[in-house]
């Protein structure tokens, strides 16, 4: 049938870890541990969605971070420096990721509703496999079990913003057309991934990296603060090319109904 057959979901900030805090804090700690260089949480969020080595590389190219690095070492960050930070990052992330494995509010019910419609649940992440091998069973213990998952270092072709992890889900799940898939993500590289794979794309403006608040902080925010943060996040996701932007995964079934109507009219992503 000419309808959505699969969703491919990001992990941190999309299905688990409201606000995407597990990776951001670890980047700050890894820079400090490896080279005694300080970066801010806001800086750590800028390249979110990329593979973690590529994320560190992108952080080193941020003008403010590069200026700090040059002031300390008299040069810009090298590949060997990135390797050293990544080596510090990995054990920290592996140790901490299980603490951020609880599904975001509404995720379990949404997954059940999608499966009731015959929709398969794929997933992929900017986390490497060593981290995912800890996160996946921890999330399963909380009730979140996608039908398939792909880590950023699984494929020789690479990770985001390329289409390969999303397309690997298409293959593994046996989906007949990429136009029958929706890629859901809270960061721009994941939206680019979906677009490059020829899929419909949905950005999440509140639950993830661009909004950047814990669940508790979000619950106590004023309506005005929520609106400002939501608009900031949505503008970035729309600028990346998202077909739709909603607050969280709980809003996805309504979006899929809208996409199904467009598919029935012959539209494509």
Swiss-Prot record:
Active site: 10 (nucleophile), 52 (schiff-base intermediate with substrate)
Cofactor binding summary note: Binds 1 Mg(2+) ion per subunit.
Enzymatic reactions: phosphonoacetaldehyde + H2O = acetaldehyde + phosphate + H(+)
Binding site for Mg(2+): 10, 12, 186
Key words of the record: Hydrolase, Magnesium, Metal-binding, Schiff base
InterPro entries reported in the protein's UniProt record: HAD-like_hydrolase_sf, HAD-like_sf, HAD-SF_hydro_IA, HAD_sf, PGP-like_dom2, Phosphonoacetald_hydro
Protein's UniProt keywords contain Magnesium: yes
Pfam families the record matches: Hydrolase
Keyword Metal-binding (UniProt): yes
GO CC terms: cytosol
Swiss-Prot/TrEMBL induction comment: Induced when inorganic phosphate is limiting; this is controlled by PhoB.
Database matches in PANTHER family: PHOSPHOGLYCOLATE PHOSPHATASE, PHOSPHONOACETALDEHYDE HYDROLASE
Family the UniProt entry places it in: Belongs to the HAD-like hydrolase superfamily. PhnX family.
Extra information: Maps to a phosphate-starvation-inducible locus previously known as psiC.
HAMAP family listed in its UniProt record: PhnX
Biological role stated in the UniProt entry: Involved in phosphonate degradation.
Subunit structure: Homodimer.
The name this protein goes by in its record: Phosphonoacetaldehyde hydrolase
Species this protein is from: Salmonella typhimurium (strain LT2 / SGSC1412 / ATCC 700720)
